Amino acid sequence: MARIAGVNIPTAKRVVIALQYIHGIGPKKAEEITEKVGIPAERRVNQLTDAEVLQIRETIDRDYLVEGDLRREVSMNIKRLMDLGCYRGLRHRKQLPVRGQRTHTNARTRKGKAKPIAGKKK
């Protein structure tokens, strides 16, 4: 198994698919990386040379925010919104939907298990 950005990527899969196992790299970025390095799309990870793996690793480190750095960046952005006290920050702080979804009936995933109301039983 090749290890790129702290992730063991599967060897039997195509390079474009295997790169998507890294948090922060999707289909488009994986294709961009293979084009920059000059690897054919149908090449598999176990067919890569050590030099090609090194090129991929350097390209990702230089040009993309992945794994722990990306997670840290996202959490810092959310923390910044909460510190500002803006509407989105307040919604994050109260653990409610942030992007305008209704909460009267839905949003159970974000709000948690429904709390029973006493006195409604008959």
Swiss-Prot record:
One of its GO terms (biological process) is translation. Keywords: Ribonucleoprotein, Ribosomal protein, RNA-binding, rRNA-binding, tRNA-binding. NCBIfam families: uS13_bact. Located at the top of the head of the 30S subunit, it contacts several helices of the 16S rRNA. In the 70S ribosome it contacts the 23S rRNA (bridge B1a) and protein L5 of the 50S subunit (bridge B1b), connecting the 2 subunits; these bridges are implicated in subunit movement. Contacts the tRNAs in the A and P-sites. Part of the 30S ribosomal subunit. Forms a loose heterodimer with protein S19. Forms two bridges to the 50S subunit in the 70S ribosome. HAMAP family: Ribosomal_uS13. PANTHER family: 30S RIBOSOMAL PROTEIN S13/40S RIBOSOMAL PROTEIN S18 (PTHR10871), SMALL RIBOSOMAL SUBUNIT PROTEIN US13M (PTHR10871:SF1). This is Small ribosomal subunit protein uS13. The gene is rpsM.
